[in-house]
Structure formats: C-alpha cells, structure tokens
Amino acid sequence: MSVSSRGAASPAHRTAPTKWLFTKEEMKKTASIQEGMSREEELASRQMAAAFIQEMIDGLNNVKDPKMKIGHTGLCVAHTHMHRFYYLHSFKKYDYRDVGAACVFLAGKSQECPRKLSHVISVWRERKDRKQLTTETARNEAAQIIVLLESMILQTIAFDLNVHLPHIYVLDIMKKVDKKEHYRPLTSCAYYFATDVIAVTDWSLRYSAASMSIVIIHLMAAYANVRIERLFADFINEDSPWYAKFDETMTNEKLREMEVDFLVTYRNSCQFHHASKFNFREHRPMLENPDVRKLDRTRDARSHSPMVHHVPDSTVNVRPRAYVPRDELTVERLNKERGVEEERRKRERDRMAGKLDSSTSSEKRARIDPLANNFVSSSSSSNGKLAPPPIPPQLNFPPPPIVSSGYNHKNQINRKNHENNHTNSSVSPAFVPSARTFDVAPMLTPPTAPKLQSADNSDMDLEDGELE
C-alpha cells in the first residue's frame, strides 16, 4: 500500500485498504447470516443501527458551543465502525443500540470531538429505554457496558481507526471538474448523499471510497438532469471513460451494478435518508397559516442532551420531554382520558352503593353547623339576625339625571352604532368599554362630594358599647 507524502491525516491520494473490503460471496458469510438471518434482515438491522447512531449524535449535539458538537465525519466513522463490527459479530447476540452508543463514543475520540462518558450514557439510555438513570449504581453499570463494548469494537477492528470516507473524494473530484463552482448545489447534495450511502447500505465493506464517490456523482448528475459528458468534458477521451482518472478499478458493469443495487435499497429505506432531511431543513418553505399547537410542540421537542438543564419534566412519567414520537403522544393522551373515565365510573359506583352523599344542595345546607348562620351574606334576610348595615345617605348617590334638551336629543349616542364601531375596530376587546355604560345619557352634572363630619361631631371619643 503506497502512502502519500501529504501525511497520514490526508487520505485523498492513498490506496484504500483491502482488509475491510469483501466480495459478494464473503458478504454471504457474515455472523448474522450464519446464525439464520437473511440478507434483507441483516441489512434492515444495519439501517436501524445507523439511524440510532444518528439519533444519538443529534442528542449529543444539542449544545450551544459548536466546538463540542460531533461533526459529520464523526457520524460516518461511527457508521463504518458499526458495519465492521457486525461483519464478525451477530445482531442476535449484541443489541445494535448498545453497539451504536459505543461506536459514537469511539468515533468521538478518533475524530477529535470527544464527549464525556456520562453524556453518552445519559443520551443512550434515554434513546433506548426512554428513561434516565437516577442512581449512582445504575450509572456505573451503564458506563461499564459502554467501555466493555468499546474495547470489543477496538479488538474486532484490530485498532484500525483509519477510515476512508467517500466525502473527501466527492469534494476532490468536483473541485477538479467545477473550478468556477457552477455546480455548487450539486456538490452539496452529493456530499450529504454520501452519508446515505454509508448509512443504508453495506458498501463500506464491499467497495472503496473512490468507487462510491464515482457512483454518487453519477447518480446526483442524473438526478439534477446534468449530462455527465458535459460535466466531465475535460476528462473524457476515446480510449478511457470519464471515471478512469479517478478510480482505476471502476468499469461500466460495476457502475451499472452499483447503481441498480443502491436504487433498490434506497427505495426501500426512505425513512433513513439523511440527505433529504438536510435539504428539507435547509430549504423548508414558509408556512402561510402556521398551527400554533404544532409550533409549540416542535419548540418543546428538545433533545435529551445532558448539557441542557432547562428542559421541563413530564408530568406523566417524570422524565424530560425531549423528542417524543407521535405514537407516544397519542398513548399518553389516551391513558390520561382513560384515567379520567375510570375516576368518573368509580364515583358513580360509590354513589350507587351509598358510599357517597347523594343529597341535594338544600339538604346539605340544612345540616350545616348553626354557627354558620352568624356570617353575613348578600342573600341573607334580617329575620331577627344580623343584617348588613344600610348604606349611608351621603354615599347613596341618586342616578344621573336624564337630560331631554334638544341638543342632547339630537346628539344622543347611538348604542348600536357604538357596538358596530367597536366590533369592526382593530382594538383588542380587553380594552373596549362595555356597552352598558351607554344605557343612560351621559351625566352632565358631576355628583356632589360627601360632606365630612367635623372634628367636634366625631364619634371617635365614644367608649366601647356606647351609642351616639
């Protein structure tokens, strides 16, 4: 294997290692297939493991500091570690969610974006079991599981952390072809399309990164309706095709086989597409009539990152809300409605059995303690009992006089017009005065102020129990 003079950190011009590239016959001898799984079942398990890795990284990246986020390269490296591990180990023996968490922890170290083990454990248990670890013993046991699986992955891949990704080759080829950046959207789409190739297929175990980049660019050119002869006009000769200078192992038969294989796989795994989700997130159309309930639900659907401390706890199962699927929201709503209905039926059964008091309000009022009659209420009568004192005459103002002059009659306020004006106006109803104010004509003469008693006639000097 020839090594470029550019250094070990730049895999752009190096031959891809053949240790982790297997033929079609060798791919039929994986550990899962030997234990009874079919080829389709194994591929579906790989796709679910890749989706779980993506979900875990989304949870860990819910931080404000961009330096603490796991990059796109770390995601693809974690996918590659998972594919290599499950070539020699079976899905029936190792849970893909546990292995996916260990791959994320290992990829963060190898790609210089490490995350704390406690953070990885917190997001892993929340994504796996929808609950948090509350005791120190449970945290230690979970940490031992992740560390043990990490050591198993390292032993399985023989400590080979050098992963070749097709993303670098895609950018390198498009940089040589599109020097003026006329096809920049095509390059961006092909870059994220390469992530789908690693996530939904097992090509990282069958083809080199250079071969995958050729197929990705060819498919993206066909998708964007760009002729490949025009795109690679400077690299096409009569003796060699357009891809000869970028990958010596590529042939027309191999290109056709890879394209058909990918289209069939990609069509059956539309829920795991990373490129389409990225494009929808970046180019999301504006909502004409947004639903406030959906916006609030999306705003509250925050990730379960341990760095986020302001996420409120759920009142149902005492855990942070985080990302709750639609099915789980429906189950919570139905459980709440069922609890309310069971409580209503229980009260009805107790009432029929005589356990609850079914008497009327008047009967209950008759059994109230007699001392309660000493309290003054607005509806109580003065049948020898305490009654509220009468209103002083100086505070009992008469109603305002109704002026019947010609001027006021002509200019009297119309109540209906006033209501229509306030209804059609844009002022908030909370600040609109009530129409009852205009049941009578406006008062022209202000009421006279009450006369205050002089200091000589004041009853402040009376003793307790004395009357005036």
UniProtKB/Swiss-Prot annotation:
Pfam families per the record?
Cyclin_N (PF00134), CycT2-like_C (PF21797)
What ranges does the record list as Basic and acidic residues composition bias?
A: 336-354
Which GO cellular component terms, listed alphabetically, does the Swiss-Prot or TrEMBL entry include? Answer: cyclin/CDK positive transcription elongation factor complex; nucleus
Concerning InterPro entries, the annotation shows:
Cyclin-like_sf (IPR036915), Cyclin/Ssn8 (IPR043198), Cyclin_N (IPR006671)
Q: Where is this region: Disordered?
A: 336-468
Q: Does the keyword Amino-acid biosynthesis apply?
A: no
Where are the compositionally biased (Acidic residues) regions? 458-468
**Keywords, ordered alphabetically:** Cyclin, Transcription, Transcription regulation
Which SUPFAM superfamilies does the entry mention?
Cyclin-like (SSF47954)
Tell me a Gene Ontology molecular-function term this record carries.
Answer: cyclin-dependent protein serine/threonine kinase activator activity
Bias regions of kind Pro residues — which residues? 387-402
Source organism, top-level taxon: Eukaryota
Q: Which GO terms describe its biological process?
A: positive regulation of DNA-templated transcription, elongation; positive regulation of transcription by RNA polymerase II
| Family listed | Belongs to the cyclin family. Cyclin C subfamily.
Quote the PANTHER family the UniProt record gives.
Answer: CYCLIN (PTHR10026)
Q: What does this protein do?
A: Regulatory subunit of the cyclin-dependent kinase pair (CDK9/cyclin T) complex, also called positive transcription elongation factor B (P-TEFb), which is proposed to facilitate the transition from abortive to production elongation by phosphorylating the CTD (carboxy-terminal domain) of the large subunit of RNA polymerase II (RNAP II).
Q: What is this protein called?
A: Cyclin-T1.1
**Species in which this protein is naturally found:** Caenorhabditis elegans
